[in-house]
Every structure is written in C-alpha cells, then in structure tokens.
Amino acid sequence: MKARPIMIQGTMSNAGKSLTAAALCRALKQEGYRVAPFKSQNMALNSYVTKDGFEMGRAQVVQAEAAGKEADVRMNPVLLKPTTDVGSQVIVLGKSVGNMSAREYFAYKKQLFPAIMEAYEGLAAENDVIVIEGAGSPVELNLNDNDIVNMGLAEKLSAPVLLVGDIDRGGIFAQLCGTVSLLSDRERALVKGLLVNKFRGDVSLFAEGAKMLERLSGKPVLGVVPYFSLDIDDEDSLSERLSAKGRGEGVDVAVMRLPKLSNFTDFAPFERAKGCSVRYVSRVSEFGAPDLVILPGTKSTIEDLRFLKSGGLAEQIVAAAHRGVPVFGVCGGFQMLGKKVSDPFGCECGGEEAGLGLLPLETVFGREKCLRETQGTIGGLSGVFSCLNGQNYTGYEIHMGQSGEHAAVVNSGCVYGTYVHGIFDDAGVAAKMIAALGGAPAENEDARAVKERNYEELAKLFRASVDMQKIKEIIEHGI
C-alpha cells in the first residue's frame, strides 16, 4: 500500500520544521512504521554525499537517520546551494545542473515537478508514512506561483499539514493566526493542527494562550514543545552555534566564519568535547590567541578567501601558523591554504586568487564536481597531529577543485589540510587532536552513537509535548 503523507510547514525559516520532522520520524519508527523523510526543495550550504555518490541536504540526512534509514537522494530531489545573494548552484537528484540567478531559477523550477513527484512516488512505494518538510513560510504570496515545496506540493499530494510557530522569537499569535488567515480556503483546509515550538519556562502557563490560538485560527493546538538543546546536526544558517565568540575553557578552537561557510557540522565533535571550546570568528578583533585555527568548507572558495584578506584575518592566520599554532583546512579551507586557487570555467565566481601559501599545492576548478564517500587510514603526518597516524576514518568529499594527488590528510609543519568532510566524526580523531594540544583526555565516543542517543531523546521530548494520538489519526485518516 502506498505511504500516507504528513507535512510539516512553518511560519518562517528556523521555526523548527527540520527537527520537528526528525522527531516525528523517530517517534513513528518507534511505533513500527516504515517512515522516510522528504523535502522537495532545500536551500542550504550544508550538504552530504550518499553512498552512491549523490549530493543532498543534511537536514534530510538527519531525518533519515532518525527514521532508521540510509540517506537517499530521493528524500531531497532539489538542493539549492547559494553562491551569491542572488544566485545558487542548482542540484537535481544529486547532480549539479549549473548556477542560476533567482530569476532564472524561478522560471526553471516548474520543469522540476515531474522529477520531484517521481522521487516522492518511489519513496511512497517503499514506506508506510512520508514525513514531508516545507520551506520557509507557505504564505510568501509573491513566490507562490508554481510552488513546489509548500502548499503547492501539499495540494498535489492531499497531504495534511501541521503548522509550526517559533514562540521564542515572539509574535506567536501573528505567526500562526496570520499564516492561517493568508492561506486560500483550499490550503487552509489542509492545515490540521498547530505546534507552538521553542517555549521557555512552565508550559502550563500557556494553556490560555493555546485556547486563544485555537479560537482565533480555527485550528487545534496539538502541542507546545519546550526549548531544548540536543546534540543533533542543525543545518540552518541561523544556527545559534555560529554566534559563539568568546573563549571558553580548555583548548581554544577558532573556526573562521566565512560568508559562504558550508558543512559546519564537521566541528560538532570539538563542540561536544569536554576541555574544548569552539568559537566562530568573522573579524580580527575576535581572533584572539587560539590553540587551533580551522578554515572550514565554503561554497565560494575564491570569494571567501578574498573576505579573509580584506578583513585582515588572512594575516592573522598566516602569523599564527608562523608562530607554530596548528592550522587545519577542510575542503575549501584546504584549498585556501595553498599557493593559488583558479576557477577558469566560472564554476563559482571565476578568476583566480593567490592562496595563503601555507601548503605546497595549487587548486584548479574543473567542470566536474567530486562527489564520493571515502574511508581509509590516516598516515604520513608529522608535527603536533602525527598522533593521528594509523587512525581509521570515514567521510565524504564534495568539491569542484582539484589540488593534485595527495593523502587524505596532508601537512607542512603545523599546517594541515583535507578534502574529507566528517573526518573528525570517527571515535578518536578529535579526542587525539585535543589531547595533542594539551587538553584533557576526551571520551572516544563515536559520533554515530551520540546521534542515536540524541534521536531517542528527541522523540521522548516530542511525545511528551504533543498529542501523538491525534497526529497518528491525522496520518491514518487525514482528519
């Protein structure tokens, strides 16, 4: 029998749609449902490569893990990776079809609906429930023509909708009631309930507020979910993680907060480790005296390299390396550490830029993107992180540029680089690095075990906060 859909929409970006969908995936899995996530179109710089070499958004990877499934590109058939404020690289079913301006994509997206529906139907044939995530708000009225991700998709699938609002940012009545009021009658009929998300304090104090929401919107409030902090990947660019500025206790890790920073989930193992603090640095005044400098991945290597130079951070990084402070580049950050980055075909912004000159390599962007999972053993390193020699790793690569043949991790003195995202996730990698920098010994817990424990905790919290029985009735009967 074909899967039944349920859709999570939100009043705005960062209302909590992604984690709500993940929580519902795990809660339904616990009850024996075969469940899969689906988001027709995702805009994100954080992405992932599946085992068969396709690129997709990390939010759907998190939801797939919560559902107990392997990541499948059909769960996110369209991924937009911003390259500028008005343009993105467009990825369809895991492969790039080129860069487009917002205007070009708006005209192009109507062609994508057949591919989106084919992906959805394939998942629906293999599962009992599909948990669909919308994007942004369903009432961006100027963008609703040819909608493929919110109510346009919900109507096509006759999917019941749960609408999530973020009370932490204020205006919950305007958010939820305003959104419901701006929907068409047909769209409004699909909304089966409201969820108040990120409530701080005693939830019982909102009981009267919930009644007011129901009276004003005509929709039942199916739950008030408390504000929580769990160790689960959060891909949204508004993530609070990026706001960390001050030095904490223990080993001080300074990650450069690049304008087009991607895959910042790479650094979660350092964030969760005791005896280590991670801060995200975007200006010289924040640089301080770190024990480790990390240049992260980016969707626009040359432009972000120019950002480091124009603001003076490049000088700080080079000076730190000359003082013996370890510097570690990942993917685009790795490319920046070399002598030169060239983009002759305009894959990102075009042109070329001198690198920081800390590693003996040059990067040239070709037309083909490298997308692959990878695993192996680290070897051949010298210096402070020679402790990683013999350490097994698994991860994935997503990059346009090629920098010649080299090992998974390379170094020159105290400067290190890798193309492998997720390399710090394996038990022992981050712990050994922290210990090498004089930090307290960290637990060698594998990141995957941490995730599994947190998915269970997420489902427990969700069940305690919502009317799960009513949600199941909505899924089963659409009421």
PLM features: residue spans?
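A Zn2+-metalloprotease active-site environment signal
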Residues: 335
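A conserved active-site-flanking secondary-structure segment within enzyme catalytic domains
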Residues: 338-390
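Catalytic nucleophile serine of serine hydrolases
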Residues: 331-332
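Flexible phosphate-sensing "switch/lid" loops adjacent to ATP/NTP-binding sites
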Residues: 1-319, 326, 343, 367, ...
